[in-house]
């Protein structure tokens, strides 16, 4: 059943709840530590503080029966910067494919590095980006392209549709990537 209200934007979301008390307390403590010469630490390790990595393993993964070593956990400053930075290891002339709708950063990061081509007037789409429609007709799961695409952004659970892929559905994409290596 379609929603009774118009959809305004399916891009970057907006928070709906205030920060939890534990976060506020931790931020205040960190600010106090940064304000004193005795407790000031400067920049943290680029892979994340050991205490944070251990806490992630202990409190997030271990209760679900998932076991990681600290070297397998990477702490970053958010998806946007990592999504943008991954392009640094890719070729400038790689072709790009995105699900549509898509988290805007996947396109924006390719625009900034010159990989997206020319913005087509009227459509708002980029000439060197293959848009793979995700609609109710295909259960918001894109078709495997019939041409080679060098970089395909798959984000599941999908933002903004919430769709997930099964292992067999993901295997189709792995097979596509291997066939187009």
What are these regions (language model features)?
Residues 1-33:
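Conserved N-terminal helix/loop that builds the PLP phosphate-binding region
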Residues 32-33, 38-180:
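Conserved core of the PLP fold type I
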């Amino acid at each position: 059943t379609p929603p009774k209200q118009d959809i305004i934007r399916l891009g970057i979301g907006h928070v709906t709840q205030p920060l939890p008390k534990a976060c506020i307390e931790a931020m205040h403590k960190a600010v106090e530590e940064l304000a004193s010469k005795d407790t000031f630490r400067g920049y943290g390790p680029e892979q994340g503080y050991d205490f944070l990595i251990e806490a992630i393993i202990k409190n997030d993964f271990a209760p679900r029966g998932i076991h990681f070593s600290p070297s397998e956990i990477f702490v970053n400053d958010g998806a946007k910067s990592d999504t943008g930075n991954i392009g640094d290891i890719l070729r400038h002339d790689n072709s790009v494919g995105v699900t549509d709708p898509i988290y805007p950063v996947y396109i924006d990061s390719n625009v900034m590095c010159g990989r997206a081509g020319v913005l087509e007037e009227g459509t708002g789409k980029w000439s060197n980006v293959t848009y793979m429609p995700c609609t109710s007709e295909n259960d918001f799961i894109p078709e495997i392209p019939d041409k080679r695409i060098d970089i395909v952004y798959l984000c599941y659970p999908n933002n903004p549709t919430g769709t997930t892929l099964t292992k067999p559905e993901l295997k189709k994409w792995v097979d596509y990537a291997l066939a187009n290596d």
